[in-house]
């Protein structure tokens, strides 16, 4: 969440940033925060003054008792008792003001970086780079869901039988290709200096709050009511929460972590032609990269993450472009975000396969993730960054469609050492 220091010292900048994100009622929300913070500070001052007065009178009581001036001491005791009652009431008022303030701050998104373009939705996103070659497919080219049926690679109907829509069954060589992609992505991350971790796939409420999924996205998360745990929508959640309530030595930054996980998203309300096949699933596999860094270095880290993801797409030989998201299309927590999309030649559409974001100090403020300066020993909020490197379903869809032949689907050369075959077909054994 945004810091009170930022809101109070740069109020107009914050309001303009929220308006750039098309956050309704930006000025009213910030005015409410400042008003509640004023109440909190005034209540704190009253409480401090009351406690100081009670302490002063308590000292007088001690002195009077030593002088055996019992009546005077008893009279002051009544004043102290009244001050204690007042302090209790003020403590309750202070606790309420602090809770109200936290609640308000949690409803306010991060403000965008100056480089974020103006815009309301995806139509206003800006293409900043393109790469790869769009293949020319024959007129009778099939979409990936038809190819998967033809070569017995994925059974969508069986997934519906077992669980429901959006939970496909991967078969034979396709199951092996899934593992190959995960291994390839993790190995490439390791080569780039990321330490692999294997996190839980369920998290508690504090973890969901720390990374900003709660209370903003609880409707999109699967909730295990009995234990009050949530299935993760991305490995960003457990990996970043490793550093919750942690003070990191400056010399240890940047911290680089990567993790494979299954991801679970309800995607409530999703339907229609854009969700066919692998285009939108409730469960999918993804490799996530996460960085913790200093404010001075975080944008260099962002550029390195963008280069890493782009390198993966080049090795997979997929046509891609990189979008800088406009203010209105950005997530709740991000300060700047880049989407990578690959071209699905049979569907004739672009599919998002990665989002790479710098959240600056917004997430770290919730997480209480700080670093200690080497020279001054003072602590400061870290910057957190994350990105998909990569999400599998749409990558698989593009590989299947773009590399289709009458005999099967050609496997990208970089994956052959990981899966042990160069053609996806129904010869599964």
PLM regions and their residue ranges:
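N-terminal alpha-helical targeting/anchoring segments
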Residues: 1-135, 153, 157
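TRNA-recognition modules of translation machinery and tRNA-sensing kinases, especially anticodon-binding
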Residues: 27, 130-429
């Amino acid at each position: 969440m945004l810091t009170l220091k930022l809101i109070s010292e740069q109020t107009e900048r914050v309001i303009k940033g929220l308006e750039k994100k098309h956050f309704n009622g930006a000025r009213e929300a910030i005015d409410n925060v400042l008003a509640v913070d004023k109440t909190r500070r005034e209540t704190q001052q009253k409480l401090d003054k009351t406690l100081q007065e009670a302490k002063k009178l308590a000292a007088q009581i001690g002195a009077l008792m030593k002088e055996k001036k019992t009546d005077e001491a008893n009279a002051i005791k009544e004043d102290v008792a009244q001050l204690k009652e007042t302090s209790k009431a003020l403590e309750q008022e202070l606790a309420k003001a602090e809770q109200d303030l936290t609640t308000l701050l949690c409803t306010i998104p991060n403000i965008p970086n100056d480089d974020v373009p103006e815009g309301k939705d995806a139509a206003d996103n800006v293409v900043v780079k393109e790469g790869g070659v769009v293949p020319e497919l024959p007129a009778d080219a099939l979409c990936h869901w038809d190819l998967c049926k033809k070569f017995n690679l994925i059974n969508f109907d069986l997934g519906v039988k077992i669980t429901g829509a959006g939970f496909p069954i991967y078969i034979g060589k396709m199951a092996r290709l899934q593992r190959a992609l995960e291994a390839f992505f993790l190995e490439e991350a390791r080569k780039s200096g990321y330490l692999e971790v294997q996190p839980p796939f369920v998290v508690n409420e504090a973890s969901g709050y720390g990374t900003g999924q709660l209370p903003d996205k609880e409707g999109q998360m699967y909730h295990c009511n009995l234990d009050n745990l949530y299935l993760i929508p991305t490995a960003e959640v457990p990996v970043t929460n490793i550093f919750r309530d942690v003070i990191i030595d400056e010399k240890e930054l940047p911290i680089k972590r990567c993790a494979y996980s299954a991801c679970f998203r309800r995607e409530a309300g999703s339907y229609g032609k854009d969700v066919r096949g692998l285009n939108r699933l409730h469960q999918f596999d993804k490799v996530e990269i996460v960085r913790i860094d200093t404010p001075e270095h975080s944008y260099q880290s962002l550029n390195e993450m963008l280069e890493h993801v782009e390198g993966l797409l080049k090795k997979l030989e997929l046509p891609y472009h990189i979008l800088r998201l406009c203010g209105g299309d950005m997530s709740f927590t991000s300060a700047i975000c880049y989407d990578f999309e690959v071209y699905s030649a049979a569907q004739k559409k672009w599919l998002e396969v990665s989002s790479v974001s710098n959240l600056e100090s917004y997430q770290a403020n919730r997480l209480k993730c700080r670093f200690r300066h080497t020279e001054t020993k003072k602590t400061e909020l870290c910057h957190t960054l994350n990105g998909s490197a990569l999400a599998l379903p749409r990558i698989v869809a593009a590989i299947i469609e773009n590399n289709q032949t009458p005999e099967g689907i050609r496997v990208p050369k970089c994956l052959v050492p990981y899966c042990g075959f160069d053609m996806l077909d129904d010869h599964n054994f």
